[in-house]
């Protein structure tokens, strides 16, 4: 039935897990092997950092001294989203005298369009748009990173030891991402590989 869309009821799997009962899912009239669901190690107990991801050809955009008011972020990002421009790292600084700086990263290919779109928004009041190419995103990838203290600090220390300047930072449950200069990518990756012993089994 699973092929036709039937699903295991979440409550049945939950009870099986609580009482450590293995669940075997198979077709009634098929001789093919089914799926055995058993209790295993928690993901958070496995090796946390599993790899490093690199994304080059990244640009940084900073809107200087934009009026801080409800809906400001949406008024900046929605016109870009409407044009299918993907935004990744987003940083908004603390308001000063009612104004903020708003920064984000985009691909190099979209940078020209971003500037034109921002300049065409009559409802946005800002002092300047600063943009630059030559950046890359380096991500520490793993499982259960949100529950593993110290990994972000270790990453930042490793980059700092190589005099790598971190431009922007973002985190999620499975990654910690830093925006750095593209020229610093090679030494950054080597340093992180060494710090987290990714070359070892």
Named regions from a protein language model:
Residues 1-171, 175-201:
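C-terminal catalytic "cap/lid" subdomain
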